[in-house]
A protein has these predicted regions:
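Metal-dependent enolase-superfamily TIM-barrel catalytic cores that perform enediolate-based chemistry
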Residues: 156, 160-272
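Hydrophobic faces of well-ordered beta-strands that scaffold small-molecule active sites
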Residues: 63, 164-167, 193-197, 224-228, ...
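Glycine-rich, aromatic-flanked loop segments that form ligand/cofactor-binding clefts
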Residues: 126, 136-172
């Protein structure tokens, strides 16, 4: 694979440099065909904000973030743009640390005189971490395009096939308890060898009926995980874990209330016959670190598209690997499959989208949306960066800026 010739600016010291020239955001929203809910929330729409980072060499990187309010994320992206214009996009660590400094007070940091963004109010920290993530993912896309290599190869990975699983079983008003079984049978037909069922919104008796129906249609060889969305205290979750043990559950995901701490996960892990997974809603490596250090987790989840970006996900992945906790990133397979490909047996796999209903934007946005092939794997291509192109006609059709 040859490298492209690029007109690169050279400083007086002879150092080749590329510069960031612009950050653009595209907030998008689509109404779902059918509202559904989890134990955590009701969803009637899907939202995503696309990030573009432009350079003076014509290389454009793309990133995406979930969450909201989207107008706040876009406003913060404009503020962050002022701090990074002219910086080298290949210096992702320096850029990440510079933007992260805006999330906390610092001595002498009341203004931007020191070249760093002024500290944000605490209620804007989640949106700030999302904006950092969107920019950071785009920088990694630039890095791959600059080197004319896919991101997984920049990380030292060689695998072009990554194990994947699909999530389903969202609650829909009026559907019988076992209705999700047909959806999961479809996942298996598409090639998935692992699936994840939404649970936690109903009582144990009704949940057992749903779990039993799914296990029967997927068979004993397909891995079954439960995504609980934080509904339980420790004691109730212990009872739940013991009740579902006969169905050979691979992990319990986000089982405990949001305010419970690593020590509570330790209490649950000591009594649960099923391994625990957690991490997708943690803002940074600093809180994830405490869960890993507790020894309570069998799987650590993180989401580059929710908080902090690909750089922070890499930090978490390395720390998890060092401590013997399996890596299982949350959603965004077109991004996270690159990370999984580089971590070998330390990574469980990437979560992909088995259906369009819950993730219509991802399927409309990208030329290729990573999905399971008949062999139950996501297949990575050899295109540079994250390996996808953006359908901007689709972006315009669902943009909130229209």
């Amino acid at each position: 694979m040859g490298f492209r010739k690029i007109n690169r600016s050279v400083s007086k010291c002879g150092v080749v440099g590329m510069k960031i020239t612009e950050v653009i955001t595209h907030p998008m929203k689509v109404n779902l065909k059918q509202a559904s809910w989890t134990a955590h929330e009701i969803s009637a729409s899907a939202a995503l904000t696309l990030f573009e980072v432009h350079t003076d060499e014509g290389i454009v990187g793309y990133g995406e973030v979930q969450g909201g309010p989207q107008h706040v994320i876009c406003e913060l992206a404009r503020q962050f743009e002022e701090c990074i214009l002219g910086m080298d996009p290949l210096g992702h660590i320096e850029i990440w640390e510079k933007l992260f400094s805006a999330t906390s007070p610092r001595p002498g940091g009341l203004g931007s005189w020191d070249g760093l963004p002024a500290p944000l109010s605490r209620e804007r920290r989640p949106q700030a971490m999302a904006a950092i993530g969107g920019i950071d993912i785009a920088l990694w896309d630039i890095k791959g395009k600059f080197a004319n290599q896919p991101v997984f190869k920049l990380l030292g990975g060689t695998r072009t096939k990554v194990f994947t699983y699909s999530t389903g079983g969202y609650y829909v008003e009026g559907e019988p308890l076992g209705a999700c079984a047909e959806e999961f049978a479809g996942f298996v037909e598409k090639g998935y060898r692992a699936v994840k069922l939404k649970t936690g919104a109903l009582g144990i008796k009704k949940e057992l009926e749903r779990i039993r129906a799914v296990r029967e249609v997927i068979g004993p060889r397909t891995k079954l995980m439960l995504d609980m969305n934080a509904p339980y205290n420790v004691q109730d979750c212990i009872a739940f874990a013991r009740a579902v043990e006969p169905f050979d559950i691979y992990w319990l995901e986000e089982p405990l209330h949001w305010y419970l701490q690593p020590a509570d996960y330790v209490r649950l892990a000591e009594a649960s016959p099923i391994p625990l997974a957690h991490g997708e809603r943690e803002w940074s490596r600093f809180t994830v670190r405490d869960f890993i250090d507790s020894g309570a987790l069998g799987f650590v989840q993180f989401d580059s598209t929710r908080y902090a970006g690909f750089t922070e996900s890499l930090r978490i992945a390395h720390y998890a690997e060092q401590n013997g906790v399996m890596i299982a990133p949350h959603t965004a397979p077109q991004i996270h499959a690159h990370l999984v490909a580089a971590f070998g047996e330390a990574a469980f796999g990437a979560e992909s989208h088995g259906g369009h209903d819950r993730h219509p934007i991802q399927h409309g946005l990208y030329s290729e949306c990573a999905k399971a092939m008949p062999d139950g794997m996501v297949h990575l291509n050899e295109q540079s960066g994250f390996g996808f192109e953006i359908d901007f006609d689709y972006v315009k059709s669902v943009s909130l800026d229209n």
